[in-house]
Amino acid sequence: MIAELVSSALGLALYLNTLSADFCYDDSRAIKTNQDLLPETPWTHIFYNDFWGTLLTHSGSHKSYRPLCTLSFRLNHAIGGLNPWSYHLVNVLLHAAVTGLFTSFSKILLGDGYWTFMAGLMFASHPIHTEAVAGIVGRADVGASLFFLLSLLCYIKHCSTRGYSARTWGWFLGSGLCAGCSMLWKEQGVTVLAVSAVYDVFVFHRLKIKQILPTIYKRKNLSLFLSISLLIFWGSSLLGARLYWMGNKPPSFSNSDNPAADSDSLLTRTLTFFYLPTKNLWLLLCPDTLSFDWSMDAVPLLKTVCDWRNLHTVAFYTGLLLLAYYGLKSPSVDRECNGKTVTNGKQNANGHSCLSDVEYQNSETKSSFASKVENGIKNDVSQRTQLPSTENIVVLSLSLLIIPFVPATNLFFYVGFVIAERVLYIPSMGFCLLITVGARALYVKVQKRFLKSLIFYATATLIVFYGLKTAIRNGDWQNEEMLYRSGIKVNPAKAWGNLGNVLKSQSKISEAESAYRNALYYRSNMADMLYNLGLLLQENSRFAEALHYYKLAIGSRPTLASAYLNTGIILMNQGRTEEARRTFLKCSEIPDENLKDPHAHKSSVTSCLYNLGKLYHEQGHYEEALSVYKEAIQKMPRQFAPQSLYNMMGEAYMRLSKLPEAEHWYMESLRSKTDHIPAHLTYGKLLALTGRKSEAEKLFLKAIELDPTKGNCYMHYGQFLLEEARLIEAAEMAKKAAELDSTEFDVVFNAAHMLRQASLNEAAEKYYDLAARLRPNYPAALMNLGAILHLNGRLQKAEANYLRALQLKPDDVITQSNLRKLWNIMEKQGLKTSKT
């Protein structure tokens, strides 16, 4: 137990510095915005949605079905909300548990000695695990590994207890259930069944390739045949159920996720896909350069046979074949009690022996021997060591390295990444075993004590360096800014783009703009980056530039609904209503098939319809507005906040004098968000109109209480007081509103109106003057300023404002009438007029 405890403790200690880390990268979508984690969402939705909260059968789903992992996130959310500390704690504890189980598994293969320690410590400290442990979404890989090892250990028990029917099939059942759980943590967990079959055939029974078929059909090997058959049946059942549950359709990804898959050249696809496992192995061997994302151009495509990286591919597969040949073709030899050797159960005086760990350490004590139990029948004639030979361990290590990695090779279907470090969490078990057994074989082979010491210290140094790299890399996962800055050298386009989002959230606008432009320098057709840059420019009132980048974003991805939405909003605010209307309509017609995030798309489409309804509403087309609002309600996703939409429905019904319907929607708005201020104000107006004055006043006062800094609340309350002939109170509310929102034309203009109606003409003049300065080319503002100046006896200033208003709107009858009256007064007073 010491090796397990020490290895687990190291795995725990190395990741303690992640407990203070924030949510990073994929954590946002899988946790922070995932509706399946919320208490109001039925927990059963977890079993119908993918890892990101999208319906599994939806055409845009990633098909990543990991309900047990999502369930663990939901439990975290129920206990600690969105505090990242508890999420990181669970990840670290899971890694420590997996490390302990892996060390226990290694002990079965390597014995209780230094080499088991080495395997466990190497796994605990390997830097390739940082994404899986420090990144919260990596819990899927760590959880799958936990049940992967439990399944494998149960199967090993099943093999060793053959002949005891109840116990052996109990262990087999446990192995199958754990394999199913591993798959429900992450898809590659199901591959443990294939690894178990490799263990049974090549390690427990020590068969070679040419012996499998002749041996497996022998009557005495019926239990082996039955076990392998059940493994195949259970694996096929799990895969069949998995395919059925996701709608029998493979996932679809954008070309930037996996550029090789999108290449038209068969040669490019072939060379690149053959090279990628080589690159993954290099990350295991030398995890010096790590990145949060390896998509896009992080690994350039191999387009010709002359690409020097093809040499790496050749070397990799040559080495792999040689290792496989060594493990599968070499005779497997065991030492008998009498000192002779046994090859696959037959005596062989010339074979080599399989030494135990104790013998490797030059001890005189031999490993314990057990009576051979093979194929369910005890064999007391020949005995063998408990430890498998080096060849057997090489075969099992290769199976652990290769088989769990196969789903990520694009062999059966294209995947949505080029390289994913967290996918290597399970294969790294095979890698650690392979390195350990190689070091052990070398240690046994050399004779000089100096060389043995050198091997010992070299492996210890490797573990130390791995641990240091892990601790340093964990620092990059502390927050998104550090993470994205660390990835610039590997994937500059993605890293700069994501860094821009972080800098923008920190209000570092110029730095964010620079980051977005850097991202577009490396990859100019990234729709998300074009959109994000457009949004940044829009928020800083650079509308012409924003429209340009929105247009480029739509050109790059015609289904990007959010770009249409913001384009329409800018056009509407610029008075280009027909262009805005067409833009909103086009957005509303975009289907959500094959989209990466259908929930976000539906939210944008709903917002487009909401703004289209507002456009119709402002134009006085209330029936058309209602029709659009109803369509928006039908299309809105469950995470969409509907209070503004419901409130506008009420407004439209009120304008159509359908007061009961209006009241219904105002109440719906307040039900969906009890502190929604616009609904308090509009519902208050309706109550005042229908004679429920005290209820109306309560709503106005509640709105002010909710946000005492919002001038519009005082404005509505002031209008109510004015209608109630409470003129002094109304005037106070008007002044308060104008002071709070002195840059908002509507508030200032309406405040001036109210003060004028309250006969406070001097105060009214002040705010009419401010309104005219806010909109110097708005005829109504100039006309009303002229009128109040007229009343206050400032006749020449009044004339100037009337004339300016008529320049902007020559046919305005009221202004013309007021000007004529003004001239009459001025002539009576002997003042010079522009007419004369």
Swiss-Prot record:
The TPR repeat ranges on this chain: 493-526, 527-560, 561-594, 606-639, 643-676, 677-710, 711-744, 745-778, 779-812
EC number(s) recorded for this UniProt protein: 2.4.1.109
Family designation: Belongs to the TMTC family.
InterPro entries named among the record's database cross-references: TMTC_DUF1736 (IPR013618), TMTC_O-mannosyltransferase (IPR052384), TPR-like_helical_dom_sf (IPR011990), TPR_rpt (IPR019734)
Gene transcribed to yield this protein: TMTC2
Pathway: Protein modification; protein glycosylation
Enzyme class: transferase
PROSITE patterns on file: TPR, TPR_REGION
SMART domains named among the record's database cross-references: TPR (SM00028)
Subcellular location: Membrane; Endoplasmic reticulum
Catalytic activity: a di-trans,poly-cis-dolichyl beta-D-mannosyl phosphate + L-seryl-[protein] = 3-O-(alpha-D-mannosyl)-L-seryl-[protein] + a di-trans,poly-cis-dolichyl phosphate + H(+); a di-trans,poly-cis-dolichyl beta-D-mannosyl phosphate + L-threonyl-[protein] = 3-O-(alpha-D-mannosyl)-L-threonyl-[protein] + a di-trans,poly-cis-dolichyl phosphate + H(+)
GO CC annotation terms, alphabetical: endoplasmic reticulum; endoplasmic reticulum membrane
Alphabetized UniProt keyword annotations: Endoplasmic reticulum, Membrane, Repeat, TPR repeat, Transferase, Transmembrane, Transmembrane helix
Protein name: Protein O-mannosyl-transferase TMTC2
Highest rank taxon of the organism: Eukaryota
UniProt GO molecular function: dolichyl-phosphate-mannose-protein mannosyltransferase activity; mannosyltransferase activity
